[in-house]
Curated annotation (Swiss-Prot):
This is tRNA uridine 5-carboxymethylaminomethyl modification enzyme MnmG. NCBIfam families: mnmG_gidA. Its main location: cytoplasm. Homodimer. Heterotetramer of two MnmE and two MnmG subunits. Belongs to the MnmG family. Keywords: Cytoplasm, FAD, Flavoprotein, NAD, tRNA processing. GO terms for biological process: tRNA methylation; tRNA wobble uridine modification. NAD-binding protein involved in the addition of a carboxymethylaminomethyl (cmnm) group at the wobble position (U34) of certain tRNAs, forming tRNA-cmnm(5)s(2)U34. GO terms for cellular component: cytosol. It holds the Pfam family GIDA. The lineage of its organism: Bacteria, Pseudomonadati, Pseudomonadota, Alphaproteobacteria, Acetobacterales. The gene is mnmG. The keyword Flavoprotein applies. FAD binds at residues 11-16. Its cofactor is FAD.
């Protein structure tokens, strides 16, 4: 087997798969090094892709010809567009996936990728050349592979430890050993490191659940694919069911809280704020006597894992016997059998402030990091980072300039900027609220924002490039025609569109920004009604958002200018609309005396600053 490559990617999780595929698409001879081939693309925690903010990242991965969206479409068994009742900027495409089908889809897509080799092995050391740059990897069995750039996507494996109650053992995932030697090596290199934790709930036996007693949660009647390349969703679609914890559940948790790995002192690393364990929920929200649980099928019946159910909402590290009591206190699960108990896993991460915006370590050139090693949580966050790291590793190995994606261009850019400039104190999860440009960073326009650039970067294949060019041209033509075609009030009123009889002509874009019905639009512009739905939806959304986009740009300019505003010493950040609980806590702890000082509080996002500025103006 070849031992010389342009790029080596360590780790076959979501970040590693995207990194390896991206580097190979760019023409780099790439090696994906993983513990086991059969676990490539495994969904370690929840069997779902996408969500609010996360779905945007999946669409951005797809726009740059990544794998995740296509794999989710091939494996999806329950599609739902979250926030459908709200504006398109915060729509969150999400899909439950059959774990076995998703893993197979990722492996098939990698097998179809030119310039890519896959090898089994555990990375134990990095090769660092005389210039202090990463030059390859040494496996624990002594094999060496050299490369012009290395991408490390270790997930939860760096000195990982699994905890169930007070029992713990080294592991990166259930049944898989941790990367202990590699963690030691990174620490010896002087990288700024810390510990974080995440967790997962018990897996339940599908046949032991009282399904008929539980409310049904159906997916969308017409599933909307993640990928622009997907023509149709072929899998049968399944429903989820909804239940909830009870006061008895909470009493059990409080009674045995000292046995939890987190609250019993066994774990030092912080867990994800926005995906808390059930112990965290009971402690942090003591006034509540119930928390919702979604019972999500892990696979289609008859497929591997088809007898398992994922109870979304009750991640835990309590002892296995207490978990059983907890499960039996929940409606519909009174006789449920636990197939595998939930657990917490603690692992090493590298402070992402040590990274350049390209995801290259500034202290160790040619080594790129992506995924949970950078302090993030979630498949989508990992996959997006992996794609950028693989793209930049290929360019670095080939002598090209690195690419940094601006936060005004993509949620990926928002995430990287947040990580590299602010660091993390807990696992970072993407939300639409983190983006100050979210009106223009929609899930439905990811390709229009990024695919053209991806073509120039060399990471987009010909099939996607041709589709993108045709759709972009159709949208541009429709936008121009809708902006040029105008109507007098009489014509609009005759079509059933309510406007002021002021004699002023209105363009079709003006009309689309109103509450005019599709039938009324069809009467005045039959050509528009005949457009492909993707084209007409985009034009309509742009028309409706045009005023907001102008205001957004103005607010951003004001944000940059108004740094001298003073803040009251007794300002109650909990009363400021638009601030997440995380932002409230950070500002309340820092108590900045001025708006300028607020901008320097670690972890404060631009969107939080705009909410603060708006509040101060209102009360002034």
């Amino acid at each position: 087997m070849t031992t010389e490559y342009d790029v080596i990617v360590i780790g076959g999780g979501h970040a590693g798969c995207e990194a390896a595929a991206a580097a190979a698409r760019c023409g780099a001879r790439t090696l994906l090094l993983t513990h086991r081939r059969d676990t490539i693309g495994a969904m370690s925690c929840n069997p779902a892709i996408g969500g609010i903010g996360k779905g945007h990242l999946v669409r951005e991965i797809d726009a740059l010809d990544g794998l995740m969206a296509r794999a989710a479409d091939r494996a999806g068994i329950h599609f739902k567009l979250l926030n459908r009742s709200k504006g398109p900027a915060v729509h969150g495409p999400r899909a439950q996936a059959d774990r076995s089908l998703y893993r197979r889809a990722i492996q098939d897509l990698l097998a179809e990728t030119a310039n890519l080799d896959i090898a089994e092995g555990a990375a134990g050391d990095l090769i660092v050349d005389d210039a202090g740059q990463a030059a390859g990897v040494v496996c624990e069995d002594g094999r060496q592979f050299r490369a012009g750039a290395v991408v490390l996507t270790a997930g939860t494996f760096l000195r990982g430890v699994i905890h169930i109650g007070h029992d713990s053992h080294p592991a990166g995932r259930v049944g898989e050993p941790p990367a202990h030697a590699l963690g030691e090596r990174l620490q010896a290199l002087g990288l700024p490191m810390g510990r974080l934790k995440t967790g997962t709930p018990a897996r339940l036996d599908r046949t032991s659940i009282d399904w008929d007693s539980l409310a049904e949660d159906r997916g969308d009647a017409v599933p909307e694919p993640f990928s622009r390349l997907t023509q149709a969703i072929d899998n049968p679609q399944l429903s989820c069911r909804i239940t909830a914890t009870t006061p008895r559940t909470h009493a059990l948790i409080r009674e045995h809280l000292h046995l939890s790995a987190v609250y019993g002192g066994a774990i030092a690393g912080r867990g994800p704020r926005y995906c808390p364990s059930i112990e965290d929920k009971v402690v942090r929200f003591a006034e509540r006597d119930s928390h919702q649980i979604f019972l999500e099928p892990e696979a289609l019946p008859g497929n591997a894992g088809g007898d398992l159910v994922y109870p979304n909402g009750i991640s835990t590290s309590l002892p296995a016997d207490i978990q059983e009591q907890l499960i039996h206190s929940i409606p519909g699960l009174e006789r449920c059998r636990i197939v595998r108990p939930g657990y917490a896993v603690e692992y090493d991460y590298v402070d992402p402030r040590a990274l350049a915006p390209t995801l290259e370590l500034t202290a160790l050139p040619r080594l790129f990091l992506a995924g949970q090693i950078n302090g993030t949580t979630g498949y989508e966050e990992a996959g997006a980072q992996g794609l950028l790291a693989g793209l930049n590793a290929a360019r670095r190995a080939g002598g090209g300039e690195g690419i940094a994606i601006d936060r005004g261009a993509a949620y990926l850019g928002v995430m990287i900027d947040d990580l590299a400039t602010q660091g993390v104190s807990e696992p970072y999860r993407m939300f639409t609220s983190r983006a100050e440009y979210r009106l223009s960073l929609r899930a439905d326009n990811a390709d229009l924002r990024l695919t053209g650039q991806g073509i120039g970067w060399g990471c987009v294949g010909s099939a996607r490039a041709h589709l993108f060019t045709a759709e972009r041209d159709a949208i541009d033509t429709a936008m121009q025609r809708a902006g040029a075609e105008s109507f007098l009030p009489d014509a609009l009123q005759q079509a059933g569109i309510t406007v002021s009889a002021d004699g002023r002509r209105r363009t079709l874009l003006d009309v689309l920004a109103t509450a005019a019905t599709p039938d009324a639009i069809a009467r005045i512009a039959p050509w528009f009604a005949a457009l492909p739905s993707r084209v007409s939806r985009h034009v309509e959304t742009e028309a409706r958002y045009s005023g907001y986009l102008v205001r957004q740009a103005r607010e951003i300019r004001q944000l940059e200018a108004e740094t001298r505003i003073t803040l009251p010493a007794d300002l109650d950040y909990r009363r400021i609309g638009g601030l997440s609980s995380e932002m409230q806590e950070r500002l309340a702890a820092a108590r900045p005396a001025s708006f300028s000082a607020a901008q320097r509080v670690p972890g404060i996002t631009p969107s939080a600053l705009m909410a603060l500025l708006s509040h101060v103006r209102q009360v002034a």
